[in-house]
Design a protein with these regions (language model features):
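Helix-loop-helix hairpin linking two adjacent transmembrane segments in secondary transporters
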Residues: 3-53
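A late C-terminal transmembrane helix in Major Facilitator Superfamily
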Residues: 11, 191-193, 197-230
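Interfacial helix-cap and linker-helix signal at transmembrane-aqueous boundaries
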Residues: 17-25, 105-106, 136-137, 221-228
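Flexible cytoplasmic inter-helical loops of multi-pass small-molecule transporters
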Residues: 46-72
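Extracytoplasmic gate region of multi-pass secondary transporters
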Residues: 78-130
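Structural signature of the two symmetry-related core transmembrane helices
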Residues: 144-159
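Helix-loop junctions at membrane interfaces in 12-TM secondary transporters
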Residues: 161-171
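Intracellular juxtamembrane helix-capping segments at the cytosolic ends
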Residues: 181-194
């Protein structure tokens, strides 16, 4: 939760910073500034990772991993499959919601300059959700936390559809907590289902499933939006999110 929270701080601050620079100097300066910062960060990371300090011994890790069962090290195939399915729905629904949120607000009559604020407060709530839900999972358990966050996400989207612009802006940080909080709970659970020697592979597979769904979902829901409109699309999205509830219940005996 803490690790994911630190990363989401960037998601909360960058949209607001980009909106500020865009308002002062135009979107080209904002895009170029972001590109330069990212490039400098990449160079810094390259030199930091070049240090061999703390690297595990390769042959020993490989020989131990070969004794971990299947090539992926998944100790509970059913549990990993259920967890990955929930992650795919959760990640895909998050990218779809963030894609269509500006269009929903514009349809409600919001000004264009409010879009940066809307995304910023949503990401801020999401950053807090990563931190808060990680601690809630320790107290309530994984299943109960997922049930609460996914229910709150689905119902929150339906409520957002009915609200005018100003109340919707106040709802967005709360919705962001639920929308983004589930992922920190799911990430921590992967380690329990994969052998320690194969966790890099297990996490790689898990992230690939989620990122792939996150990339495919917006175009697919875009087709629905073209046919039925943004409000109907987000209502369908809320229904899809709620399908994670029975999946989370099935995860309990897994």
């Amino acid at each position: 939760g803490t690790y994911n929270f630190s990363g989401d701080l960037g998601k909360a601050t960058w949209p607001a910073c980009a909106a500020f620079v865009t308002a002062l100097a135009g979107w080209r300066w904002a895009a170029q500034g972001i590109g330069l910062v990212v490039l400098a960060t990449a160079v810094g990371i390259f030199f930091l990772l070049a240090s061999p300090v703390g690297y595990p011994a390769g042959p020993q890790a490989t020989s131990t991993a070969d004794r971990a069962g299947n090539g992926w090290g998944i100790r509970n195939t059913r549990g990993f499959s259920l967890l990955s399915t929930i992650h795919a729905i959760d990640n895909g629904s998050r990218t779809v919601f963030l894609t269509f949120l500006p269009f929903l607000l514009l349809g409600k009559g919001a000004r264009m300059d409010l879009m940066g604020l809307a995304l910023g407060v949503t990401f801020a709530g999401g950053a807090a959700g990563k931190f808060v839900c990680g601690h809630l999972a320790e107290r309530w358990g994984i299943i109960r936390t997922v049930l609460v966050t996914e229910t709150a996400t689905g119902l929150g989207i339906l409520l957002l559809l009915a609200l005018p612009v100003t109340p919707a802006l106040f709802l967005l940080p709360v919705l962001g907590v639920a929308l983004n909080g589930t992922s920190s709970v799911l990430y921590g659970t992967v380690a329990e289902l994969v052998a320690p020697e194969r966790r890099s592979r297990g996490y790689g597979l898990f992230y690939t499933i989620g990122i792939g769904t996150g990339a495919l979902a917006p175009p697919l829901f875009g087709l629905l939006s073209d046919a039925a409109g943004v409000p109907v699309t987000l209502a369908v999205l809320a229904a899809v999110i709620l399908t994670t509830l029975p999946l989370a219940r099935l995860l309990r005996p897994a």
